[in-house]
Amino acid sequence: MSMGIETTMGEQIARYLDLATAETKLTAANMANIDTPGYRTLGMDFEAEMRSAIDDAGQGKPVRRVQTHTVDGLIARPDGNNVSMDRESLNLAEAQLKFKTGVALLRIENQRILDAIHADK
């Protein structure tokens, strides 16, 4: 993923954090619907969404709604629900790791800015 000069690193990190939050909410929704007959697991393509978010930011576009899709290939129970708590727990852990990574990157970026401000003193 190339990071364009058109957007600041802080803006890109903010969009990354927004997507990590969206992924967490999507996973939570799947978990909340584990007992809903006929519910189909929803997912998102994090990398594609991040590329779009960076491209949109470079063009001055606002953050758009995340595109979700039903996840194919999962085994459905007799009631038609295909949510797996094990799969969703793993997805939640991955989303939390992405969020923690984004927060760490934001701290580094903020420190870099502070260092630049204080470099002349």
State where each predicted segment sits.
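Amphipathic alpha-helical polymerization modules
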Residues: 1-121
